[in-house]
């Protein structure tokens, strides 16, 4: 690794020259802008209309930049491994991680050989953003002064984490930074990580009141990660839903005939290989079969910001035919192999938005690049479907693929990909409903679900979760669904995780001698929990007690659960002692009394939604305005998810993830939908649409979606061309 300091004039000379009015490129932008109409509805949501798909993409990117250019740019700064250029040395190894997989030279070559139609869209993508910067000279990009079409390939799939983020920057620092820092381990009393994921439901016409397919879209993401948009062209594009900032396709959404919803999958879509490395002179080789192959060594440069100006670090990185080396384990170098098909991924991401039937949607799934996600589908023909993951390598089942495998053994090579038919898949199950909550597919449609014994172990690495249990409860016992009753099911307040936990706590209390001071201390709390219906509400004191008790117990025994390789939930219910359970309740009660004056504090007084600024990392303040939220963390089985905690300087808990864009859709001769987003459309605190959806968000009161142009009548705030 080498370090260099770049003189300021080098940095300035590398920056792109801003466009001028005399630039013929500007004339082209102006001409395209005249072919685009943006209609902002009374929630500030942009409905973009254009003759060609490319015109709509141009307008979409302009509208996104208007709403939150910072988030648009930041997503691509991160995707290209350039965070350290604005955030400094702390981001060096995050950037190195991205640069291991995202190489500008390679991306430019892939762009050059992309299909003409896709290149046209990528050009429109860059033009829309650059036109915004031209029209808004007061906006200073942090890093990307001019967007280039090839850059769209660096962020070609819409999920939050993706496969690359499975690589630990800490491990990269230990290996390439030559620092003996060890792997990060959770602290003994660390707060359990907030569950990620999403919910998707599809209800067949046979199980709905109007005999039309119903669809529930409920991604659980960090707040403000996606914007709500509509894209309409004269080339068959008419799509509505959530677009990840900076991308030109709707990721979770629907068109006039079909809808799709992605949930993070438990399928094993990547592998790590233990490479046996042999050094000969200054070169590295690795064993493969009976031979030794030369390891590829290349230089990656990571520029980073310092108080004195820009500097850079150069790393010599290594690769085998499996992929880049990401860490070392017991003397073996670990290579990672994952999907790297940006052109196909962008093709699939866009093409599915125009798929209006199951057959057409199924065809997009055959590109196999939606690697880390399951998909729920419904359409106006009455079809409902579940697709399990979309990139599952075929492997030799003799190996344990949950761990790194021997890279020197040719038998560990992938043998192609599993087809849709070879993967867990459902089409119109007899149950009349299907769902996924990031759990296994083997309960996706009740008795109609795929059978676990029909598939290799690597096809699904997870299991059931509390949301899955809850989903079956609300879907299997209800007939004649309507949009209203499906919303009610999705916001059902039951917390099934406490079905085992609360009885175990009460049993601990009942088995403790009456003379115990600990029993006396928690007697009133136990009486409340004994009569609790295990439903959340903003007025519920038992919800407060149960959540704080559960979190305290998790903190107390989390390390023990990990050491025994058990899930924390299983450990809580089966391995904790009566004293641990009661002690955790006493500790939680003391914490509540210290922070809020009494343990008898209603849940809504603690669990709050707040949006004070447009910062990507939000600040929170108990002195600022906020709203009560009834629904809890998904950890406890709440289908409506709200991941909240206290922050430095706060006692109240503020949410940063969970329900984000939420929608219910009814398909038929026409499409009807309702939706709500966390906060509002705009990232500007001065905008009336910064927080105008917050009350509806916290109460589950979805608003009407204006899908058809005539529905915008009397609901239009502004109609304009980009640049006006």
Where are these regions (language model features)?
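Bacterial N-terminal signal peptides
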Residues: 5-15
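Sec/Tat signal peptide C-region and signal peptidase I cleavage site
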Residues: 17-21
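Substrate-recognition/specificity elements adjacent to catalytic centers across diverse enzyme folds
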Residues: 23-226, 234-237, 241-249, 254, ...
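N-terminal leader/propeptide and maturation segments of large enzyme subunits in energy/redox metabolism
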Residues: 85-122, 126-138, 306, 328, ...
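Acidic, low-complexity N-terminal propeptides/linkers enriched in Ser/Thr/Asp/Gly that mediate export
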Residues: 118-216, 221-222, 368, 380-384, ...
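Glycine- and hydrophobic-rich flexible loops that cap the catalytic core of alpha/beta enzyme folds
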Residues: 236-247, 253-256, 262-405
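Hydrophobic alpha-helical segments
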Residues: 241, 370-478, 553
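Proteins synthesized as precursors that undergo proteolytic processing into mature forms
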Residues: 345-373, 380-381, 451-504
């Amino acid at each position: 690794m080498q370090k260099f300091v770049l003189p300021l004039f080098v940095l300035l000379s590398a920056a792109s020259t801003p466009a001028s009015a005399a630039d013929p490129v500007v004339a082209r932008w102006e001409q395209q802008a005249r072919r685009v109409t943006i209609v902002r509805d009374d929630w500030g949501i942009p409905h973009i209309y254009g003759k060609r798909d490319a015109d709509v993409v141009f307008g979409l990117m302009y509208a996104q930049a208007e709403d939150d250019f910072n988030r648009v740019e930041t997503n691509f700064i991160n995707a290209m491994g350039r965070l350290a250029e604005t955030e400094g040395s702390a981001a060096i190894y995050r950037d190195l991680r991205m640069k291991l997989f995202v190489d500008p030279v390679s991306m430019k070559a892939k762009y050059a050989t992309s299909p003409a139609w896709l290149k046209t869209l990528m050009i429109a993508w860059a033009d829309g953003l650059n036109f915004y910067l031209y029209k808004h000279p007061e906006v200073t990009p942090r890093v990307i002064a001019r967007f280039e079409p090839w850059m769209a390939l660096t962020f070609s799939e819409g999920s939050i984490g993706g496969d690359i983020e499975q690589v630990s920057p800490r491990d990269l620092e230990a290996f390439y930074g030559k620092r003996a820092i060890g792997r990060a381990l959770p602290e003994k009393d660390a707060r359990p990580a907030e569950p990620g994921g999403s919910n998707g439901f599809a209800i067949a016409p046979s199980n709905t009141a109007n005999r039309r397919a119903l669809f529930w879209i409920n991604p659980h993401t960090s707040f403000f990660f996606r914007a709500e948009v509509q894209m309409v062209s004269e080339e068959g594009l008419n799509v509505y839903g959530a677009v990840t900032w900076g991308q030109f396709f709707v990721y979770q959404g629907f068109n006039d005939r079909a809808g799709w919803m992605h949930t993070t999958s438990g399928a094993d879509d990547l592998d790590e290989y233990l490479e046996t490395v042999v050094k000969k002179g200054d070169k590295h080789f690795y064993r493969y079969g009976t031979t030794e192959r030369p390891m590829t060594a290349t230089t990656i440069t990571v520029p980073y910001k310092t108080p004195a100006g820009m500097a850079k670090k150069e790393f010599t990185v290594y690769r085998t035919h499996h992929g880049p080396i990401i860490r070392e384990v017991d003397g073996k170098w670990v290579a990672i192999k994952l999907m790297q098909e940006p052109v196909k991924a962008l093709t699939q991401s866009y093409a599915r938005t125009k798929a209006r039937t199951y057959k057409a949607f199924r065809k997009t799934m055959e590109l196999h690049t939606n690697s880390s996600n399951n998909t729920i589908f419904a359409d106006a023909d009455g079809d409902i479907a579940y697709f399990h993951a979309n990139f599952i390598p075929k492997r030799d089942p003799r190996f344990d693929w949950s761990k790194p495998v021997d890279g020197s053994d040719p038998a560990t090579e992938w043998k192609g990909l599993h087809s849709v038919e070879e993967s867990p898949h459902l089409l119109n199950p007899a149950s009349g409903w299907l769902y996924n909550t990031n759990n296994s597919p083997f309960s996706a449609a009740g008795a109609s679900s795929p059978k676990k014994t029909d598939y290799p172990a690597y096809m699904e690495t997870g299991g059931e979760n509390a949301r899955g249990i809850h989903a079956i409860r609300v879907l299997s016992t209800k007939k004649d669904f309507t949009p209203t009753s499906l919303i009610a099911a999705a916001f059902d307040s039951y917390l099934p995780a406490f079905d085992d936990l609360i009885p175990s706590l009460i049993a601990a209390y009942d088995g403790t001698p009456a003379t115990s001071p600990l029993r006396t201390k928690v007697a009133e709390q136990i009486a409340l929990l004994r009569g609790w219906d295990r439903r959340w509400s903003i007025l519920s004191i038992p919800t407060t007690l149960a959540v704080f008790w559960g979190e305290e117990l998790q903190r107390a025994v989390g390390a023990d659960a990990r050491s025994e390789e058990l899930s924390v939930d299983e450990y809580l219910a089966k391995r904790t002692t009566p004293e641990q359970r009661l002690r955790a309740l006493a500790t939680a009660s003391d914490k509540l009394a210290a922070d809020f004056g009494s343990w008898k504090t209603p849940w809504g007084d603690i669990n709050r939604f707040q949006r004070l600024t447009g910062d990507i990392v939000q600040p929170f303040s108990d002195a600022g305005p906020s709203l009560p939220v009834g629904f809890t963390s998904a950890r406890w089985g709440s289908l409506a998810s709200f991941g909240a905690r206290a922050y430095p300087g706060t006692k109240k808990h503020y949410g940063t993830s969970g329900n984000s864009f939420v929608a219910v859709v009814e398909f038929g001769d026409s499409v009807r939908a309702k939706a709500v987003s966390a906060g509002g459309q705009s990232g500007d605190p001065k905008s009336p649409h910064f927080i105008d959806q917050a009350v509806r968000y916290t109460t589950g009161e979805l608003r009407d979606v204006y899908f058809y142009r005539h529905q915008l009548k009397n609901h239009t705030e502004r109609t304009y061309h980009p640049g006006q």
